Curated annotation (Swiss-Prot):
The gene is CGT. This is UDP-glycosyltransferase CGT. Residues 280-281 are annotated as: UDP. UDP-glucose-dependent glucosyltransferase catalyzing the c-glucosylation of 2-hydroxyflavanones. GO terms for molecular function: 2-hydroxyflavanone C-glucosyltransferase activity; UDP-glucosyltransferase activity. It comes from Oryza sativa subsp. japonica (Rice).
Amino acid sequence: MPSSGDAAGRRPHVVLIPSAGMGHLVPFGRLAVALSSGHGCDVSLVTVLPTVSTAESKHLDALFDAFPAVRRLDFELAPFDASEFPSADPFFLRFEAMRRSAPLLGPLLTGAGASALATDIALTSVVIPVAKEQGLPCHILFTASAAMLSLCAYFPTYLDANAGDGGGVGDVDIPGVYRIPKASIPQALHDPNHLFTRQFVANGRSLTSAAGILVNTFDALEPEAVAALQQGKVASGFPPVFAVGPLLPASNQAKDPQANYMEWLDAQPARSVVYVSFGSRKAISGEQLRELAAGLETSGHRFLWVVKSTVVDRDDAAELGELLGEGFLKRVEKRGLVTKAWVDQEEVLKHESVALFVSHCGWNSVTEAAASGVPVLALPRFGDQRVNSGVVARAGLGVWADTWSWEGEAGVIGAEEISEKVKAAMADEALRRKAASLAKAAAKAVAGGGSSHRCLVEFARLCQGGTCRTN
C-alpha cells in the first residue's frame, strides 16, 4: 500500500499490467521506458506467463535486456480450461485466462511495494477491485484510438438504450464525437453472447472507477474524440483522460544482424517504396494474398512486403512462391522485397525511401505512420481496424475505401482496385503534405511542454500522490 512518504518526495513506483498481444504489449513497454527514463518513476512491468506467442517472449526479453531500469514481475496464470470456449480467438482466450487470474495479483503487488497501477483495458473490470483492496489508484492504458475508447465508454449505454428492440447493433452516435457506422463496429460486438462482447461491456462499465485513463494518441490526430473524452461528454463521471501519444519506440533495443531489408531500402530512391504489412496477429487468406500480390505488381511501384500467412504461432511452412502465385517473386525481384521475417517497422517508416504504408490499421501502426509522416492506404481486416481507418481518413493521414470487404464478409479486394489505390496515393502530393504536418504535430506533442508530454508529467504527479479514486 502507498505510504505518506510517497507524497513527500519518494519516487513513485508504478506497476504496469498489460494484457496479451503485441498490439497491447508494445505500448506498455514504451510507457514503461518513458516513465522510468524521463518522468522520475520506478517502473515494474508484469509479465504474464506463459506468453501467448514467441513474438511476445522475444519482445519482452529484448526490452528488459535493453532497459534494466524497468523491473520484471513474473505472474503465473492459474489453470484455465479453454474447452469452455471451443472456437474462440487465442487472444480472447488469453484475456479470459488473465481476467480469471487477476484476483491472485494481490500478493505480487504487496511484495512489489507499488504506489500506483496502470493496467490494460482488457483487464479493467477485474484489476480495479484488486487495486482497491490494496489501496492503490488504478489507471488504464488504452492501447487503441481515442475513437475506440469513446466507443468502449459509450457502448454499455448504447446497449442499455436499445435492449429488447431485436435490431442488433447499428450505427453508434457517440456524444461529442461522431457516428461510428454499423459496418465499422468490431465483428464480435454484433454478437451479444460473444466472449469478447462480454469482456468489452464489463470493462466499459468499469472505466468510471479508474483513477485516470491514458490513451496512445495526440490532439492533432483525434481532436474530436480527445476533447469529448476530456470534457466528460461521452460518459458521466468519467475519470481524467491523458492523451500521451504517440508513445515512441525504445531507441536502443538490439537489431537483428541477419536482417537485409534496411540494405535493400538504402538502395532505393527517395519516396519510391510502398511498405506493406498487416501486423503480427492475423493472417490474410490465400486468395486475398494473391490479389494483393497482383495489385502490387501491376502498380509498377517498388515495395517491401512483410507477409504473414498464419494465426499467432501456428506452423508456417508454406513457401512465399506458393502463397503469392507462380512466378511472382521472379517477376518482381528487381523492385520488390518480400519477407516472412520480423522487421523493425518504426525504422522502416522513418526511412527516406518509404512513401506509402499499406496497412491493416492496427493502432500501433497508425501512430507510427503519423509520427513518421508516411501516408497510409488503409486495408482493415478485423476488430477495431475500421474505426482506426476512419481516424486515418478524418485526420488526412491516409485514404480508406470503406466499401472494401474485411474478415467475415464475402468477397476479396481485387488486384485492379488495389493497384489503382496504390498509384493514386503515391501520386497524391496533398496527402503527403498532410502526413508530414501530422508528423510535426506528433513531434511537438511529445517534446518538452507539448500536450502529450504535459499529460505524462501530470500522470507521474498523480502516481506520486498515491491516492485512490473510489467512485
